[in-house]
Amino acid sequence: MGPILYCILACMSFHANVNVCHIFLQMWRPTEAKVYLPPVSVSKVVSTEEYVTRTNIYYYAGSTRLLAVGHPYYPIKDTNGKRKIAVPKVSGLQYRVFRIRLPDPNKFGFPDASFYNPDKERLVWACAGVEVGRGQPLGIGTSGNPFMNKLEDTENAAKYIGGNIADSRECMSVDYKQTQLCIVGCKPPLGEHWGTGTPCGTQNAGECPPLELKNTTIQDGDMIDVGFGAMDFKALQANKSDVPIDISNTICKYPDYLGMAADPYGDSMWFYIRREQMFVRHLFNRAGTVGDAIPDDLMIKGTGNTASPSSCVFYPTPSGSMVSSDAQIFNKPYWLQKAQGQNNGICWHNQLFLTVVDTTRSTNFSVCVGTQSTSTTAPYANSNFKEYLRHAEEYDLQFVFQLCKINLTTDVMTYIHSMSSSILEQWNFGLTPPPSGTLEETYRYVTSQAITCQRPQPPKETEDPYGKMTFWEVDLKEKFSAELDQFALGRKFLLQLGMRARPRLQASKRSAPSSSSTAPKKKRAKRI
């Protein structure tokens, strides 16, 4: 500002042209710094503890022994040609997403219902404790591909092969990354994986497609990340030989912990327990034309076999290492005191979702069946036997629920409606529609055939938002019990609270003998 003012005064002092001075004034501009306005106030998401009142009433609920048996690599279709699944795919590398159905506490029969007012309050369940029981012994399951894309052993290379082989695929098997996971919430968990994105222009054949991070709901039966990445192998690997056959035609998902932690209501993940471990067992490279060629300034080519470089697409085979009972997260109780989100364990819509992954019990059974009656004296032949693979899983789910009540004030109902309007509909609350401004018609003879049919429309059924998804349904509507001391998890919960169960059997006191049957007491003689 100082030099500009000096130039203006200098021009005026030497009788300069007025237009020149006008140009000097046009060159000066005010500051172009951005002005930041305060953000617009938005509605605040509050914790459920601010409008939910907890009672001292607890209930235990447990499932039956849950079993699943199937083929560990792929589903077996029916041989009748109806394309029905005869044997489902059941693998230790799948997500088990249980949808737990709970009874409506507002329709529950309580011995003493004086603790709440049904005209002004509504009841909800809060998850206080959970224990996931796992049966079957510890074991490691393997998978592989009879045509695995393996060119060279890059860890212990015997000789330089190069990329001149037409088909170098081999039969290989691996053991996967070790994962133990348990996620609890009232909505299904959210997963993430890498898939094919949308290119900006025309994409030629053989070009690498753009990648896009996609978020989808984790359903029961989805494959976990086994060590080859969370990606859509069906869309991104056309040769179906880069990974084992159980994931070569599907999607491996990884839980979106960041997205679920950022959920303002925290319904998808109240808390989670996770344990993962992996190390690299072998190092190989893949056959095929390298799409992104190595720059010439990064290497010096040789002669003979080293005239052209071999494939630089290196990859490892994962391994989960040893499994041990010392590092188990299952078969032990977990108590929910404070959730990581705003929902502190409230089971909206009388349901909760329990997601389980356990690769430490992924043993695959080998079942051998003779094709014909064979005797021990006949020579052994491979064609006389058929080999089958099966995998079995065993679960036992136990919960402790706390009864809570919500005071139906105007602010609370408005907040719950903004969070999920279906909750109020489930409580038999509806919004009155505004009066219509149009003139409606009303016929007198509603049964007359001279007018259009006046049959009332049936009420619209409530649509299940998860009706088209796949979950393991577990109905606990008739499994609730107030006698916590009669169950293992209930006794652990009472011990954790420092409470004791009420004694059921009281020792009977002996009745005092009648005065007629008692002998008179002798007076003690005084000593002199």
Curated annotation (Swiss-Prot):
One of its GO terms (molecular function) is structural molecule activity. Keywords: Capsid protein, Disulfide bond, Host nucleus, Host-virus interaction, Late protein, T=7 icosahedral capsid protein, Viral attachment to host cell, Viral penetration into host cytoplasm, Virion, Virus endocytosis by host, Virus entry into host cell. It holds the Pfam family Late_protein_L1. Residues 508-519 have a biased composition (Low complexity). Residues 504-528 are annotated as: Disordered. GO terms for biological process: endocytosis involved in viral entry into host cell; virion attachment to host cell. It is found in: Virion; Host nucleus. InterPro entries: Capsid_L1_Papillomavir (IPR002210), Capsid_L1_sf_Papillomavir (IPR036973), dsDNA_vir_gr_I_capsid (IPR011222). One of its GO terms (cellular component) is host cell nucleus. Belongs to the papillomaviridae L1 protein family. Self-assembles into homopentamers. The capsid has an icosahedral symmetry and consists of 72 capsomers, with each capsomer being a pentamer of L1. Interacts with the minor capsid protein L2; this interaction is necessary for viral genome encapsidation. Interacts with protein E2; this interaction enhances E2-dependent replication and transcription activation. Forms an icosahedral capsid with a T=7 symmetry and a 50 nm diameter. The capsid is composed of 72 pentamers linked to each other by disulfide bonds and associated with L2 proteins. Binds to heparan sulfate proteoglycans on cell surface of basal layer keratinocytes to provide initial virion attachment. This binding mediates a conformational change in the virus capsid that facilitates efficient infection. The virion enters the host cell via endocytosis. During virus trafficking, L1 protein dissociates from the viral DNA and the genomic DNA is released to the host nucleus. This is Major capsid protein L1. It comes from Human papillomavirus type 34.
